[in-house]
Every structure is written in C-alpha cells, then in structure tokens.
C-alpha cells in the first residue's frame, strides 16, 4: 500500500494521508452484542499504545472509537523525545514527521549576550534563542493517529469505528461492565446500536472522557487550561521552518506557539490554568490567536484538563483511565502525546501480565493506578516550578547564563 497526499479545503495545506481503513459497517437493524475481557474506548495515542500491547497478549480485546479515520484532532502537534522513541520503535515513516529549528522567546533573554548563546549552540535573535540544528520535531495529529490505527490493524487488534459510547454500568462490583451506545456511518447517520460487556474498560477517550464522567463518584473540579490552534500554509507565514514558543506575558507561563508541520505551520495560544493567572475568555483567546496568526484555516479551541498536585479520586474496579482522561497533560513543557502513549502502554502491560498471572480485576486496577501515581509524582515537578516562577523565585535568564558560563569554563577547569 502506498501513501497519498490530501489538501485542506480551508487553506490548501498538504498533509500525508496513509491508506484509509474500511471503517464503515454494513447496515444492520439488530443490536450488536460483544463480550470481551478488555474494552478500549478511544483510539488516539493512548488507546493505540494500549492496543498494541494487548494485540500480542492473547486476551480477548476490542477497541472502539466514535470517529472514522483519518480524522483531525486539535493539538499542538509537537513531539517530545519519549514520544519520538516510541514512534521510531514502531517504525513510523519519517516523511510524516517535520523537523525544524526550535526557538524560544522570552523578555528576560534581553539580558543575554550573543557570546553566551553561541557557547551553548544557540543564536540570539533579539529576545529569542534559536537552535542551530533542526532538532524540533512535530507531526500533524491527523497523520499520527491514522498511522497508529493502521499499526494496530497490522498487529491484529480488533477495532470498530463510528461506535460512540453513551452509557456504562454494572449490576454490582463483582459483575462486568456493560458499555452501550450508537453506531454511526462516516456521514454521521445512526445505523444501529451496540452493547459490549467487558471485565475491564480502558478510558482513552480524551479531554471530555465519557468513561471518566460516568464512573467516578467524586467529580472534583479539574483545572482547565485554554488553548487554540490555527493551521497555515507555508506561504502565509514568515519563517515556516522555525518552531517558536513565545512567552509574551511577564510572570505568566502562558505562551503563543507556531510550530512547523508538513506543508505549513500550527499556531496557537496556551493560556495557563494557574490560580494566580487571570482567566481568559473564549473571545479574547480567539482575538489573541488572530493577532499571533493572522492568516490560515479556521481557529479551533479546546480546554485541557491539566496535571496538578491535587490527587484524583480512585477509579472503581475495572476502570483504567489514561492520557487526557486521567489529567496527565502538562502544556507548560509540551507533554501531552508522550504521556498518553506512556499511560496507554502501561495499562496494556499491566492488563496483559495481570490476566496471564491470574490477578483479580481489582488487583489489576490498583496496580495500574499505583504505577501511574508514581509517574505522576515525577511529572508534577513543573507545577512547583510554575509556583516558583510566579513567586519571583525563578530567574530564568540568570540561571541560563550561569549554566552557559559553566559549560564554557568546564573544559579549562578540568585540564590536568
């Protein structure tokens, strides 16, 4: 099979399209019933990472998604090292990953000198530090998620598309979960209904997780950060080969971004959720986005349930939450896709080992949550860093200058 190109109807932006899967079901009037050991709800990075693990486990698994692929997903599209490692281990085609020159702009960088910047491999562009090598990497989510689903299909993972979960219940704590919903065609027409009985349901269904909302008795308020996204063609922007993070607002970790992607750029605003940052209205978010990216496709916005130091309520037995559904995102330092992958992979590994070694569903659930909580503690450090910055403890430019001086002085001080 060969890949082809598709063009956005809004801007003409070219993206790579992998072979589309035949995800439409044949029309049927009967209720579709299934019984499995594990049901994965959502086939983004978390659900597909979980599915890849379980496809080789021998367990009876089904993965569903309300969409038909390929489909777009609002995202900044940036890839961290951990995400890249997973993708390369699974042989992602290099042509759908974009490389560019990373650039960070902060008002405090006015204190730096060209000599200090050059000493650490950067060039100083006004108040911005730009990498000298094209090491910033990104991928459009429509390409990433379609490739991940294609990989799951090749691995033999049973999947259904157009299946939208609407209810989830069980008779008692010792009974399996029953998930029900509607099946829609690519044109969004309801064709039939489904009912799946599963011992474990893995919630990989993102920001507005239905699995999370229907199973957690305590609905503690989750901090929501705001973000926007606008795709533009290469001829609509300056420096399309530079991926910029622009911290425009003093004593505020919010930032504007413009990341290079195949065929153009992904630009947007991340507005911080922190208690000491004034809230931003949706109208103001759109206005800031237009100012930052005057030309391009329609602007899309979303809320991000972000990682904080607050503990999340325990899930009931047989419910494993991953990625955005578990509030693991840290937009401050770009961690979204990688944490979705990590938590999905972790869920798959623990489910595979747990069922194969005769663990109970309760034991599997708590083992997953305990393992994820250990990682969560490590990931929460950036929240403390935000507190330090807003409290005036952090001196970014000063610390950067000191580290650069140390890197310059170190060779001479270590000579015999």
Predicted regions and their residues:
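A conserved beta-strand/loop capping segment in the N-terminal third of enzymes
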Residues: 84-146
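Beta1/beta-strand and adjacent pyrophosphate-binding region of the FAD-binding site
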Residues: 29-46
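C-terminal helical "tail/cap" subdomain of flavin- and related membrane-associated enzymes
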Residues: 349-416
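FAD/FMN-dependent oxidoreductases across multiple families
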Residues: 166-167, 273-350, 356-359
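Conserved Rossmann-like nucleotide-cofactor binding loop
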Residues: 46, 69, 208
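Conserved N-terminal glycine-rich FAD pyrophosphate-binding loop of Rossmann-like flavoproteins
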Residues: 68-88
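Predominantly flavin-linked oxidoreductase catalytic cores and closely associated redox partners
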Residues: 151-295, 311
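Glycine-rich FAD pyrophosphate-binding loop
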Residues: 39, 55-75
């Amino acid at each position: 099979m060969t890949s082809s190109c598709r063009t956005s109807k809004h801007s003409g932006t070219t993206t790579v399209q992998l072979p589309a899967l035949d995800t439409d079901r044949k029309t049927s009037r009967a209720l579709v019933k299934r019984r499995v050991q594990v049901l994965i709800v959502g086939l983004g990075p978390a659900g597909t990472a979980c599915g890849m693990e379980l496809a080789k486990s021998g367990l009876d698994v089904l993965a569903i998604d309300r969409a038909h692929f390929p489909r777009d997903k609002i995202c900044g599209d940036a890839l961290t090292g951990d995400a890249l490692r997973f993708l390369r281990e699974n042989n992602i085609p290099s042509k759908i990953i974009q490389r560019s020159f990373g650039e960070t702009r902060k008002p405090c960088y006015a204190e730096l000198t060209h000599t200090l910047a050059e000493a650490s491999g950067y060039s100083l562009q006004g108040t911005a530090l730009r990498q000298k090598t094209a090491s910033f990497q990104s991928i459009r989510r429509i390409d990433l998620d379609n490739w991940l689903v294609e990989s799951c299909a090749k691995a033999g993972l049973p999947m259904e598309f157009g299946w939208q979960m609407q209810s989830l219940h069980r008779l008692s704590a010792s009974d399996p979960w029953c998930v029900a919903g509607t099946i829609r065609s690519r044109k969004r027409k309801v064709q039939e209904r489904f009912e799946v009985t599963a011992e474990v349901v893995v919630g990989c269904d993102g920001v507005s997780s239905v699995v999370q909302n229907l199973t957690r008795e305590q609905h503690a308020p989750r901090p929501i950060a705001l973000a926007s996204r606008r795709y533009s063609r290469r001829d609509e922007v300056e420096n399309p080969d530079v991926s910029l993070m622009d911290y425009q607002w003093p004593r505020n970790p919010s930032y504007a971004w413009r990341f290079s992607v195949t065929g153009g750029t992904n630009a947007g605003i991340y507005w911080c959720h922190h208690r000491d940052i004034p809230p931003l209205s949706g109208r103001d978010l759109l206005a800031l986005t237009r100012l930052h990216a005057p030309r391009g496709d329609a602007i899309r916005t979303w809320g991000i349930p972000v990682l904080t130091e607050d503990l999340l309520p325990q899930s009931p037995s047989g419910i494993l939450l991953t990625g955005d559904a578990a509030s693991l995102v840290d937009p401050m330092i770009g961690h979204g896709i990688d944490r979705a992958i990590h938590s999905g992979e972790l869920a798959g590994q623990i489910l595979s080992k747990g069922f194969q070694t005769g663990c109970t569903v309760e034991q599997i659930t708590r083992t997953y949550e305990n393992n994820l909580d250990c990682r969560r503690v490590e990931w929460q450090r950036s929240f403390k860093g935000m507190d330090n910055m807003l409290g005036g403890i952090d001196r970014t430019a000063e610390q950067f200058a000191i580290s650069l001086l140390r890197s310059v002085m170190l060779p001479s001080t270590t000579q015999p």
